[in-house]
């Protein structure tokens, strides 16, 4: 069987094998797998290996500027107006579902939790954070000290859930499989140790395919997202009463797998700079892939959830009342918040999808500009 094996055209300082603990864990996984590790398993180790992966180690992730030692900024760190606008949709969802619990997956620095708790007040009896990172949990506990009586942390999904769920930039950090078409044949891309000791790629023939046919015969690299779909399906099975809202960057299926998007969407973030090499500086930078929102919607529907809507972050926040908040804000606050809705910043690239357990309703955030028909 033919394999396609090659290096990454990297500079020589990436070539040596580092004898650090994360490298040893990856090498042990490679050995157990026969020398070839599917990318989703590599990505899981790089991001979540206990105490060593990017989201499990002590490095600072979130912040507005690289001078802070951070790697990227998310909307809640940019401005509290994000959380205040989202809170209006959450309040409506709590009322419609008859619940008083709020759940957040991957709470990051705790900024969004603090904003929601402040805005919602007594409408939330309990705020539960599900996060794999012990280091981030410590930071969240510090940020949420004023709300300590309401907040609870969990490291895994409970068997049963009631309430409203929010997840901001959670789905993009779930491991993906890489598939590539070369010479008309499909391969799965995995990670190997090259002869010189560096990490490299090796493509192996596979039965895996993107969810849609990719037109043309040109070489093509993309991702498939079984873990994100499985997460939504499990969430749907366990959400007995409530709703869920996920905010992330991504596209509907037709855009995601467009013939011209032939280089995939995997990106890395460090020091507020982006690169496309997940095999360099492993554990020291974020690895992400855009979200296939059609796959997310179908996973929820197949498991019994109703899709409340799907739209851009800009339209969602404006529907939720961001404009009056901007008018009442200071000039510096308005400048920062403009990034949330500007089409060349977060406004168009980021999307919002909403689900309800049971019967849906005309949700505030999707009142205008709902794009569910594009999924």
Please place each PLM-identified region on the residue numbering.
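Rossmann-like AdoMet
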Residues: 2-105, 109-156, 161, 179, ...
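Generic recognition of stable, solvent-exposed alpha-helical segments in well-folded globular domains
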Residues: 21, 38-41, 77, 81, ...
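A residue-level signal for conserved active-site and pocket-lining positions in enzyme catalytic cores
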Residues: 46, 165, 296
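Active-site flanking residues adjacent to catalytic metal/cofactor-binding acidic residues
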Residues: 103, 130, 165-168, 247
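Catalytic P-loop NTPase motifs of RecA-like helicase/translocase cores
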Residues: 136, 173-174, 253
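A short SAM/SAH-binding and catalytic strip from SAM-dependent methyltransferases
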Residues: 160-180, 225-226, 238, 244
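A mobile, often basic/glycine-rich helix-loop segment
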Residues: 166-212, 259-269
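Long, Lys/Arg- and hydrophobic-enriched amphipathic alpha-helices
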Residues: 210-375
